[in-house]
Amino acid sequence: MRTPSDKLDIMHTALNDINNEVTRAVKLHGPLNSLHEAYSVILEEFDEFWEQVKVNPKKLDLDGQVKRSANMEVELIQIAAMCVRTLMDVEI
């Protein structure tokens, strides 16, 4: 079970990773131009996360489970980063 300190460490790491991903995505792709574009980008990232969720970890070896967990973390960071980009780029 995660302690409050563990959760705080995870939050700090995630926020740093989100910041890095926002910076990388803006440099690579430029700003989002509309809510429709933002929705499609967020949905694409969410679908990539969902693909990992649907994998039965009991059918994976240890290496596969580790890769799945890492992939889910990456996708969650990307989802959060695209939400931040939407707040930055699109007038709501």
Regions found by a protein language model. Give the residues of each.
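Flexible "arm" and connector segments at domain edges
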Residues: 1-92
